């Protein structure tokens, strides 16, 4: 895609979200709608954002038994999302069924490790090894399950890209140089992630919380 930036629209009010997208749409490539937005506004909200004319990424992080996840994927066919997320830790069968149930033009990507987590967090959940090792294991599982790609931090995307040449890689938790990292622990700049093989760059607060969101989006676009 010509512009890999997807705006993370984590705004509870629909009209405010639409207004923000209208302001910045010339400088982004799509809009990511997460659980907060989807649970608040449902199918109607997705349709309203889609009217802005940009691809919609539904970041629903589906994680359940295979049959339930497949049914959930079928229920969002009508929304025609460009991308949908499932948790790679849900296992191969779940990912296979999710991909089989997805629309023909929808990319299904597996969430590997949230960018708010680090090695200590992994240890507390009983996962051995480094974040890098954990992401690489789940990336291999997602590839073998037939997914289009994965979600990973910018710190891992370079290594995953070398392992999975044809993969589609979504990188969240990005911060322009000089920005505060907030609750993100494994961050890089949008330019670095793109250079390392990211297909989609998910950027939220550096644009949505900026004094001038349009200028912030324009500045990020100029670095790519």
Swiss-Prot record:
Its EC number is 4.1.1.23. Keywords: Decarboxylase, Lyase, Pyrimidine biosynthesis. The active site is at residue 61. GO terms for molecular function: orotidine-5'-phosphate decarboxylase activity. It is an enzyme of class 4 (lyase). This is Orotidine 5'-phosphate decarboxylase. One of its GO terms (cellular component) is cytosol. Catalyzes the decarboxylation of orotidine 5'-monophosphate (OMP) to uridine 5'-monophosphate (UMP). InterPro entries: Aldolase_TIM (IPR013785), OMPdecase (IPR014732), OMPdecase_AS (IPR018089), OMPdecase_bac (IPR047596), OMPdeCOase_dom (IPR001754), RibuloseP-bd_barrel (IPR011060). CDD domains: OMP_decarboxylase_like. One of its GO terms (biological process) is 'de novo' UMP biosynthetic process. It catalyses: orotidine 5'-phosphate + H(+) = UMP + CO2.
